[in-house]
């Protein structure tokens, strides 16, 4: 499984090992340009707490295979960092090359079902400088997710504030208000279910719905009511 990402001046660190014991991982780098880039393998603790420029960076260009080996102590993790002065896409593929009949499962590597001496490929996992960790199949880190949401909100607002869209929204809101206030109140004869009175409820309009007084004075009308 490979992971292709945009690499710039801010380093991105791929986790090499996260369990106690020795590890040996081959990292295949395949950039999309001929621009130079830098890499280094170090502990997670140094990555989080050291100025990036103080790390022993290696400069290279083009395709590269880097073998990273070491021993993971309890609670420690090893990471592989990449950065580039000129932003470029770099494809990263990682293989666990621990040999023997029981190869270590550092970095969540699953054993090959072919033979015990073959390579065991691990999914590259990226650690950003804020310490968030995510895998190539799990979406965004916390910081990246927040930036994605902000970008989506800004894009939506940019669409909504267009003049024609605003006019359309105002028309829909006005129509809903009209439907609610104008069409939702019964006329002045109890709750007969008839809904057709004006929005303005003034004494003049209320009087306009009353029957003529000659009707109310009629004995037949009074008896029927």
UniProtKB/Swiss-Prot annotation:
Family to which the UniProt record says this protein belongs: Belongs to the ascovirus HvAv ORF58 family.
Keyword Glycoprotein carried by entry: yes
Disulfide-bond pairs as recorded: none
Chain coiled-coil ranges: none
Transmembrane annotation, as ranges: 156-178
Protein name: Uncharacterized protein ORF58
Keywords: Glycoprotein, Membrane, Transmembrane, Transmembrane helix
Sites where a glycan is attached: 48, 58, 105, 108
Entry keyword annotation includes Nucleus: no
CC per GO annotation: membrane
Membrane topology: Single-pass membrane protein
Organism: Heliothis virescens ascovirus 3e (HvAV-3e)
Record's subcellular location: Membrane
Top-rank taxon, per record: Viruses
């Amino acid at each position: 499984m490979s992971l292709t990402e945009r690499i710039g001046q801010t380093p991105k660190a791929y986790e090499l090992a996260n369990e106690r014991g020795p590890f040996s991982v081959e990292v295949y780098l395949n950039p999309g340009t001929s621009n130079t880039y830098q890499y280094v393998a170090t502990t997670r603790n140094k990555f989080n707490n050291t100025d990036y420029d103080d790390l022993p960076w290696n400069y290279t260009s083009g395709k590269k295979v880097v073998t990273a080996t070491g021993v993971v102590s309890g609670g420690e993790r090893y990471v592989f960092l990449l950065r580039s002065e000129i932003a470029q896409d770099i494809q990263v593929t990682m293989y666990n090359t621990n040999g023997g009949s029981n190869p270590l499962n550092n970095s969540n590597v699953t054993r090959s079902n072919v033979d015990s001496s073959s390579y065991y490929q691990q999914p590259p996992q990226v650690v950003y400088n804020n310490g968030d960790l995510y895998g190539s199949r799990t979406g965004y880190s916390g910081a990246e997710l927040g930036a994605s949401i902000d970008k989506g909100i800004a894009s939506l607002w940019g669409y909504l504030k267009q003049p024609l869209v605003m006019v359309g929204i105002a028309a829909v809101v006005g129509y809903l208000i009209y439907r609610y206030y104008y069409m939702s109140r019964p006329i002045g004869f109890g709750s007969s279910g008839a809904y057709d009175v004006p929005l303005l409820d003034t004494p003049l309009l209320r009087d306009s719905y009353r029957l003529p007084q000659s009707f109310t004075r009629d004995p037949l009308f009074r008896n029927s009511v």
